[in-house]
Amino acid sequence: MEVAAKLRGAGMSAQKARLVADQIRGKSVEEALDLLTFSTKKGAALIKKVLESAVANAEHNEGADVDELKVSTIFVDEGLTMKRIRPRAKGRADRILKRTCHITVKVADQ
């Protein structure tokens, strides 16, 4: 049994979120939560919330035992990119790209 949770439109680039996602792929849920709790990366807090949601979904909807769950799949896709403008000297302007991402976490029995 595999249960998923998604966060769409997370306010960070997919490249930065993937750094954290790669660390917990394949680990047990308990080990992954410990790693995310003590990580200093911004993406760790977002991924931790999605992982906790997936665990809650598995426990509530499927009646799974939390101690036997592991992170079977985790991936980060690019979301919308919002374009903003920063005024510069002499009437020029630079384009600012505010990137977002979609985080998907799937947990399964070991």
From Swiss-Prot:
Subunit (UniProt): Part of the 50S ribosomal subunit.
NCBIfam families named among the record's database cross-references: rplV_bact
Membrane-spanning residues: none
GO CC, one annotated term: cytosolic large ribosomal subunit
Gene: rplV
Task performed by this protein: This protein binds specifically to 23S rRNA; its binding is stimulated by other ribosomal proteins, e.g. L4, L17, and L20. It is important during the early stages of 50S assembly. It makes multiple contacts with different domains of the 23S rRNA in the assembled 50S subunit and ribosome.
Keyword terms, alphabetized: Ribonucleoprotein, Ribosomal protein, RNA-binding, rRNA-binding
InterPro entries: Ribosomal_uL22 (IPR001063), Ribosomal_uL22_bac/chlpt-type (IPR005727), Ribosomal_uL22_bac/org-type (IPR047867), Ribosomal_uL22_CS (IPR018260), Ribosomal_uL22_sf (IPR036394)
Lineage: Bacteria, Pseudomonadati, Pseudomonadota, Gammaproteobacteria, Cellvibrionales
Molecular function terms from GO: rRNA binding; structural constituent of ribosome
Organism of origin: Saccharophagus degradans (strain 2-40 / ATCC 43961 / DSM 17024)
Protein family according to the UniProt entry: Belongs to the universal ribosomal protein uL22 family.
Protein name as annotated: Large ribosomal subunit protein uL22
HAMAP family for the chain: Ribosomal_uL22_B (MF_01331_B)
